[in-house]
Amino acid sequence: MAKTFDVVVIGGGPGGYIAAIRAAQLGMKTACIDDAATADGKPALGGTCTNVGCIPSKALLQSSENYEHAGHQFGEHGIQVKGLSVDIAQMLARKDKVIKQNNDGIVYLFKKNKVEFFQGRGSFVKTGADGTEVKIAGKTAESLLAKQVIIATGSNPRALPGADFDETLILSNTGALAIPDVPKRLGVVGAGVI
């Protein structure tokens, strides 16, 4: 027997989780399905932006700006920093902490607004007079029946022909946000927000 909802949102990125929360705030019984998970299997809500895009890139940018300020601009204020160095592992750990705080914040907002979350991959089964049936493949196999379905499945990086991502020499945004050392040379193709 399928659980019944007014709205089911497939995708927990910025478009999906905001749509789910707003639908619930407007009084609709709402569910959200997303398959992104952390290394320990917990929900990684927030999509590309939160997990491997805007948020982590800005967290690393802030760390690098602080390093730059300490090395060049603090002196103008009479602050001398001796033995300044970069700890990439700590920068990456901080980035991961920022991501987790954002993931946990979305889970909290779902609970606060009574959005029922299902971890897994949603797919359409059939549409009938009662609504659309969506099957969830994930930790549990469940079916949901919804009057309305919002598809907010986000985006994926696109490799150039003949230059597939190997995350060693040719990096996607995911690989670029986990580089363990500062590269001596780096070329960037693309001009997206990440």
Predicted features and spans:
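Glycine-rich flavin
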Residues: 2-5, 21-28, 32-182
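Beta1/beta-strand and adjacent pyrophosphate-binding region of the FAD-binding site
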Residues: 2-15, 182-192
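N-terminal glycine-/charge-rich "phosphate-binding" loop or analogous flexible N-terminal tail
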Residues: 13-19, 23
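Mid-domain beta-loop-alpha active-site segment that forms a flexible
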Residues: 106, 193-194
